[in-house]
Amino acid sequence: TEDCFPEWSPTDGVTGNWNSQYDSISVSNATHVWIDHNRFADLRTRDEMQPTYFGHRYQVHDGLLDITNESDLVTVSWNQFASHDKTMLIGSSDSAPEDREHLRVTLHHNLFDGVGQRAPRVRYGKVHVYNNVYRADKNTNYRSSWGAGTESQIYAENNFFNAGDIPPS
């Protein structure tokens, strides 16, 4: 999924940023959802292939999978997420308290291969993350796997991390 007309936001961060609009899958105001046996990746227009404008790489992708707006009882299983930066967002924003008591999500048996961050990034949710594989190498712009934000809970167990040839920092 790519946004042909991303927006430049000069007040996003210290020096501005590009923001894209479209996710590969958006789960919004939904309950009892099962996302199973899919492959999500940026193959045709990978981030590192984009030109630089205003000192930042042109960003034509948003999330691969976002679960927002009071969605609840969502299972994400046996999927592959590959070659992407901002992978998965669970929760709308820090200023969306209506997400409280919702966003109960389970992630299991997924492969996160060459993703940069947000696997997942959680706000207000209660997320069980187990038996997933996280793989990165020196070509991955890896920042973090899990992000626990406002009033979130992440229960993680039996996940495997392979940093390949990334030197320890």
Predicted features by range, described:
Residues 17-21:
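Short acidic (Asp/Glu) patches
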Residues 166-169:
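Extracellular low-complexity, O-glycosylation-prone Ser/Thr/Pro/Gly-rich "stalks"
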Residues 1-14, 29-46, 50-64, 70-92, ...:
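Right-handed parallel beta-helix
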